[in-house]
Amino acid sequence: MKIHREGRSIIFTVFFLLVLLNVGCYLLVFRTLIYLFSLIASACFFSIVVIFFRNPDRIFIGDTKNIVISPADGRVVFIEEVFEQEYFREKKIQISIFMGINNVHVNWIPIDGEVVYYVHQNGRFWAAYLPKSSTENERSTVVIKRNNGEHVLLRQIAGVIARRIITYVEPNQKCRINEQLGFIKFGSRIDLFLPLNAEILVTLDQKVRGNYTIVARLE
């Protein structure tokens, strides 16, 4: 299992602290049962942290023309026509994917094109599955222009636990499916804003896989 670069320092820190904790427990607590419990609990916690930062090798091998690939693992929690007010200032179809703590938290580029807009905004830390998290939470907004001039907006949203959004792209950068967009640490959500004529290929509560599940088809 590959570990994502965003998790290496955290994993090392957690490992070091757990070693100190268990050494201290061994030296100061003279009860074998308590020490064994500490070892087991530490091993379980460390395993969860390592699994969270896993970085799977996923390559989409199909035709990428006119499709929108899921930018993240998770569950579809919202599909609705909304007024997007930050960039488009017009109605779009919003698809929201909630990433639970057990999901891979790598984010992928959903379409081929060029980045034309990127803004990071500080904000609140509401639960990521709530609709208001899209406009009130800490978030990064990326807009990608397709070759035909059409724009698709993607928004990385921090949740209650997630306090750090990593975004690798910047304006004027060419991007394509199979490339990583970024990473959100410890629970989060991704919003997609698509043209009204997009053919939506997912349903509410459907589980999706990043860089694998086709969520929509564009004209």
UniProtKB/Swiss-Prot annotation:
GO MF annotation: an example: phosphatidylserine decarboxylase activity
| The entry's keywords | Cell membrane, Decarboxylase, Lipid biosynthesis, Lipid metabolism, Lyase, Membrane, Phospholipid biosynthesis, Phospholipid metabolism, Pyruvate, Zymogen
Query: What InterPro entries does the entry give?
Result: PS_Dcarbxylase (IPR003817), PSD-A (IPR033175)
Give the positions of the site Cleavage (non-hydrolytic). Answer: 187-188
Compartments where found: Cell membrane
Among HAMAP family, the record links this protein to: PS_decarb_PSD_A
How it assembles, according to the record, is: Heterodimer of a large membrane-associated beta subunit and a small pyruvoyl-containing alpha subunit.
Name it: Phosphatidylserine decarboxylase proenzyme
* Gene source species: Azobacteroides pseudotrichonymphae genomovar. CFP2
The gene for this chain is psd
